[in-house]
Each structure stands twice: as C-alpha cells, then as structure tokens.
C-alpha cells in the first residue's frame, strides 16, 4: 500500500471526487477502485479474481469482503468530514447474505446519520448480477483534529 497522504489531502481528494488519488490511498487490494463520490456516498468496484481472495470452496473470502467494505465506509465518512474533523471506526458488523463468486463486485457506502461526535454508516456489496452478497453497518466516533 502507498504511504498515506496527509489526512487533509485525502479528504480534499474525496471532496473533489479525485477517484485516482482516493483509489491509490484507500484501495487496499489490487482490483479495487473508486467509482463515484457524492456527499454521504461512495461507490467502488472490485475485480475479485486473485487466487488469494478465493477460499477452497471457490468463493471470495469473507475477510476480503470486509476489507472492501472498509474502503466503502471509510470513503463515505470522508465525504462528510468538515475541515479539521477526524473519524475512527467504533464498531463494524458485516452480514454475509450470499456467497460471492470470483468476479466483479459493486459496493456502495452511505452515511445514515452524522452528528458532531457519532456517525452511522452502512455499506452494501453486490455481485455483477445485482444480488446482495454482504451488508455492513458501522458506528464511527467523530472528533476534532486538535
């Protein structure tokens, strides 16, 4: 993974919809790429075909789906942070709905509610046919970067 940019630079890239820079910073696995950002929303795509991401039964490993979910929720919260705000995950729950076969996966992260101290973010991961394969809810602690 690349050396992280200063947080303000990463937040600026998210706000400016700089998909290449955000993918470089937050795309922790080859094949993951940012597709779209809007206030409170992030969309990513992942070509989950590398042998290491597939379990012995032929499905994408849950841990890798969790990493993909992390990119979705990280960038969704990043779209809503004001200058000087930071956020960290307080809790994350992932429910695996349907086994994910290797191939293209789509993901969407969305802010449910953001206050001055707590934010609630959700993500959905679907296969190329549009079937839901994982649902994620997360709670974030929001703080000032003092």
Model regions: which residues?
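Terminal targeting signals and extreme-terminal segments of soluble enzymes
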Residues: 1-146
């Amino acid at each position: 993974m690349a050396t992280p940019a200063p947080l303000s630079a990463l937040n600026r890239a998210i706000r400016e919809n700089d998909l290449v820079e955000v993918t470089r910073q937050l795309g922790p696995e080859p094949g993951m790429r940012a597709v779209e950002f809007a206030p409170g929303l992030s969309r990513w795509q992942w070509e989950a075909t590398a042998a290491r991401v597939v379990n012995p039964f032929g499905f994408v490993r849950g841990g890798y789906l969790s990493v993909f979910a992390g990119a979705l929720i990280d960038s969704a919260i990043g779209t809503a942070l004001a200058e000087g705000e930071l956020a960290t995950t307080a809790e994350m729950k992932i429910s695996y709905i349907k086994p994910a076969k290797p191939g293209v996966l789509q993901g969407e992260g969305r802010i449910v509610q953001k206050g001055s101290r707590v934010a609630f973010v959700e993500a959905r991961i679907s296969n190329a046919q549009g079937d839901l394969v994982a649902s994620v809810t997360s709670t974030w602690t929001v703080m000032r970067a003092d």
